[in-house]
């Protein structure tokens, strides 16, 4: 936009994908560098992918980091080079230097994680299932016990957070996801999975799914995701299902066991905002609307009868 007149000068991106954070603007070379999600077929729509756009040409977007992984890029002051560290939850970080065109010109040192593996640590696994509509793809991560035995059957616990700003579903490699990893070592399959309404990273329709529904929008997707995983993997015991979360996850876990008491066996709710009508009106009205018909109050009364 022209800052003096407010008039649109150029539309830099277009299409059914999401343009994310701007990392750098080259005012001399007339280029903008930014992360995007969901543009490339076959690449996880949650991965941070770096693009270059021309400030003076509409929709002149160039992919700079093509690997199917989440990228963290630092661009040099001269814009001639960039350092890229990319990974997935199960792929160790790869650190490279690229030229301005995205071509890898040097591979930097790799981390030595052999001592961690020798201690019994295992990377989690990313999975994909369908939402309760049977159409929308949902993405999640699964942790297993270090002594996992595929011939045994394990209870499953879902670590939840309803959004709407982000989904607590890791995309990058780490050995420090302590809560899920520790819980798995107690003999559980632990998952966290995204759901409709959880994040703007999947586009407007996905993000706005929870509008006019302050509480129930994520519940059916979590339940259906677990049912699909149990049907896919015989080592999951679908009769022993737990759910837990903090803050929004606290309200979601409590709402889930009250809504589906015959499905969830146990729930742990930490610091839940159980009535969004009286919690932080600013973000609630922006993302969920105004509860003019007291829908939340009526549904709360109905579901609490399941206690």
Language-model regions: role of each:
Residues 1, 48-52, 95-97, 140:
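Hydrophobic beta-strand positions in blades of beta-propellers and related beta-sheet-rich domains
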Residues 1-28, 37-42, 53-71, 100-130:
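Multi-bladed beta-propeller domains
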Residues 10, 48-49, 93, 204:
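Extracytoplasmic/periplasmic beta-strand context in beta-sandwich domains
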Residues 35-36, 143:
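Generic short beta-strand segments
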């Amino acid at each position: 936009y022209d800052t003096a007149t407010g008039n649109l000068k150029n539309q830099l991106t277009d299409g059914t994908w999401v343009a994310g954070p701007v990392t750098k603007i080259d005012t001399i070379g007339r280029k903008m560098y930014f992360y995007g999600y969901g543009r490339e077929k076959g690449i996880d729509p949650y991965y941070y992918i770096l693009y270059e756009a021309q400030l003076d040409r509409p929709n002149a977007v160039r992919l700079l980091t093509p690997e199917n992984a989440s990228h963290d890029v630092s661009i040099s002051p001269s814009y001639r080079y960039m350092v890229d560290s990319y990974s997935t939850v199960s792929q160790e970080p790869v650190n490279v230097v690229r030229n301005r065109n995205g071509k890898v010109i040097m591979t930097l040192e790799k981390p030595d994680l052999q001592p961690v593996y020798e201690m019994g640590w295992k990377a989690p696994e990313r999975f994909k299932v369908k939402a309760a509509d049977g159409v929308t793809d949902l993405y999640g991560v699964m942790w297993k016990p270090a002594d996992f035995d595929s011939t045994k059957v394990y209870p499953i616990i879902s670590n939840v957070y309803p959004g709407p700003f982000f989904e607590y579903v890791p995309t990058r490699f780490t050995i420090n996801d302590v809560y899920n990893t520790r819980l798995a070592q107690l003999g559980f399959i632990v998952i966290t999975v995204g759901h409709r309404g959880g994040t703007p990273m999947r586009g407007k329709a996905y993000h706005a799914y929870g509008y006019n529904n302050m509480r129930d929008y994520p519940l059916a997707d979590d339940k259906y995701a677990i049912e699909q995983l149990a049907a896919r993997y015989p080592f999951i015991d679908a009769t022993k299902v737990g759910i837990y979360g903090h803050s929004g996850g606290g309200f979601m876990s409590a709402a889930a066991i009250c809504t589906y008491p015959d499905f969830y066996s146990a729930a742990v709710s930490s610091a839940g905002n159980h009535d969004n009508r009286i919690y932080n009106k600013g973000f609630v009205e922006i993302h969920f609307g105004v509860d003019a018909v007291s829908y939340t109050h009526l549904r709360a009364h109905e579901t609490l009868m399941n206690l």
